Amino acid sequence: MKTKLKILYIGLLLSLVNFQALAQIPMFSNPIIKGGYPDPSICRVGEDYYIVNSSFEYFPGLPIHHSKDLANWTLIGHGLHRKEQCTGRMNLVDVQSNGGIHAPTIRYHNGKFYIITTNVYQPKKDEPAQMINFIITASNPEGPWSDPTIVEGAPGIDPHIFFDDDGKIYYIGNHAPENPNFQGEGEIWMQELDSTSFQLVGERHFLWRGACQGTWAEGPHIYKKDGYYYLLIAEGGTSFNHAVMIAASNNITGPYDANDRNPILSTRHLSYDYWINSTGHADMVELPNGEWRMVCLGIRNEKNRASNMGRETLILPVKWEKEPYWWKEIKYNWPVCNPTTGKIEKNYSYFLPIKDSIYVPTQREYEFQENYIPKNWTHRRVPLENSYDLTTNSGYLTMYCKEPTIKERTGYNFIGIKQKETNFEVSTTMRFDPTLDGEEAGLCLIQKDDNYLLFDVKREDKENVLQLVINDKKKNPIIKKDLVMGKKFKNYIELKVIAKGNTYQYYFRYQSNDLWELFETTNSDILLSEGYTGAHLGLYATSNGTKSINFAAFDVFKLEYSYPPLKLKK
């Protein structure tokens, strides 16, 4: 009996030691880039890793993140950072919602970075969309980036650029084939690019229509490994049936043999209630030690199998394994995603030594003391001239009451940052002296031109009104609540929105030493992402069509994902 107890004691002791050892292993969490950063493409230069994402109608566009450990990522710049890059055929001035920059690829070759991508622009609602495929280059990923070179005669979206060992450069894209076998069938095509002009030359080759008769074969990437070319694509559409497929060939022009075990990554076989869904649109990178990793997009299952953040960037390990089938003449090596489970996990131990800070701030406070806007602040479309500045009122972000409104397809005066967690607290302090009916400014939480929350001050019938306006896509904008402030409003107000659980709570106070007053409570599902982008939290000013030279001055913008309880006015 004593022997058994001794063995049991030793077993428990070893288990405790193992548990403590595991507890000390540094871990990181997916998504690695939180907020609406979909369609990731990754490249490595030495020990540095870079990811670029789709940006759609937002400006600056093509956000670029950097990391040394594949877990901690820092936004270092944008590929589209000048108005001159985004006019004419590259129109991001009045681009439609869910249009704009789709699915880029980033690559490094001979001392230069390349980004190739598509601007989807629909001139009018009833007209066909134009697919403008283009290339930009830079010697430094932080910029500046070149003006776009449009690749003429390139149909489809989601282009890829591939540099082969023989010096040739190839464009790989997708299109809708003639005589499709089923509705939504896509096809991957390839053509050589002139290395100087970046224009298509030579014969066009049609490579693959996908593995499982899934719709919308897109997002191609080609890799060369051990003498074989591997074609990785997305299939099934960017929702619950999204998936990653792969094929291989010993010739870049094909024919390509599909992996019998496709899809190699998906959540289509998992419960709709798994923590992440819609995974797909992947890219891979080889580490210096020969290991591989894959990045892809996914949607967190936060509420109703969706989230405000939309499609975010995830990472997972990949292991190459040779086919064991003795009867096959050619036995390919294929990438196996997360080999032990085949699905994306929420937490991983670090793939590489930790070289960046692992501190993740739960609070960001912007006081606008500098003479520049932080890199993570973006506009919906290229902003109008003289929409804002940091010099008119020192220490304030001054936003002018321009005529366009939030419902219009133009660069109305909004600036904000991506929402990164479901629960948050956002607040601002605003100095605003509206004098003309229609002048309006305050907090704006937005998904699209037709899906937003405005918690702001508006001049109506010669009165200053605090209002909550909601557009939840199901109906026209409604004023959920309004309050004539009268003499209590002395051109200064603090606004706060707290998102927690199933509710949004809206607070205000007239002076910084006042207690907060609860203005209204709503459901939290108003901004669930149904399009290509995630929610943004920011600031807004308009004159609602009236000519105005007035402005609102914002002193502080504060965003917290972990916050203390409020002291409320009874």
Describe every region a protein language model picked out.
Residues 23-570:
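Carbohydrate-active catalytic/glycan-binding domains of CAZyme proteins
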Residues 1-25:
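Bacterial Sec-dependent N-terminal signal peptides
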